[in-house]
A protein has these predicted regions:
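Mid-chain, structured segments of secreted extracytoplasmic proteins
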Residues: 71-102
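Sec-dependent bacterial lipoprotein signal peptides
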Residues: 1-18
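Structured segments of extracytoplasmic/periplasmic soluble domains
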Residues: 55, 92-103, 177, 181-189
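Short secondary-structure boundary motifs at beta->alpha junctions and helix caps
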Residues: 72-80, 146-184
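Surface-exposed short loop/turn segments
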Residues: 19-38, 43, 99-146
Length: 203
């Protein structure tokens, strides 16, 4: 972990570099080398991500850094997401679920096609320079066209990280762990213990 006395100096250096460097672009999507799961027999044929709501201050492409002391927030224009954060999170979740489930997202589901509908509300997508990345969100998983219980859950997970590239990688890992838990939930499988610790669902 970076010394708290050095963090403001390091951030100042990053902000100074912003004015003179070409932006570096990052994505939340995992490597395409992940093997796609074979679809299994099930009552539903796909899923639809209906909503991905992100706090207004994060609805941007610039990387948002939070200082560990004082709560100061800095925008890094030289470190940007490849698309606005809500789109990055949506693309990462959709591709992650497709890889794990072997079924497509149904953007315009045909009549009588059974699918899972997903609504996500992001409370926190935090990058604390020199310390950690944190993801906090809630979601509703609703069956459409088939019989199943609607799930309403909350997720809070963190991953240690220091530099901007490390924070990006940490956010990718958090996104992948959440996709693992959500995919297990959709398949009616037990969520692994290491993931269930970050998860709280309404009974």
């Amino acid at each position: 972990m970076m010394s708290r006395f050095l963090i403001p100096v390091a951030i100042a250096g990053l902000l100074t570099a912003c004015a003179s460097t070409t932006p570096t672009y990052y994505t939340l999507q995992a490597s395409t080398s992940t093997a796609v799961a074979a679809p299994v027999a099930q009552a539903w044929k796909g899923f639809q991500l209906r909503r991905m709501d992100v706090p207004a201050q994060l609805d941007r492409r610039s990387f948002v850094l939070t200082q560990s002391t004082g709560g100061q927030v800095n925008l890094l224009n030289d470190s940007q997401w490849a698309s606005p954060l809500p789109d990055e999170m949506s693309l990462a979740l959709v591709s992650g679920l497709q890889d794990r489930l072997g079924v497509p997202q149904l953007a315009g589901a045909a009549a009588k096609t059974p699918y899972w509908q997903i609504d996500v509300l992001v409370q926190r997508f935090e990058s604390v320079y020199g310390e950690r990345a944190t993801l906090e969100l809630s979601w509703a998983l609703s069956p459409v066209g088939f019989e199943a219980k609607t799930r309403q859950c909350r997720w809070l997970d963190s991953e240690p990280a220091a530099s901007v590239p490390e924070l990006v990688q940490a956010h990718r890992q958090l996104q992948q762990r959440w996709a693992d838990a959500l995919a297990a939930q959709m398949q009616g499988k037990p969520v692994p213990v290491n993931l269930s610790k970050a998860m709280l669902c309404a009974s």
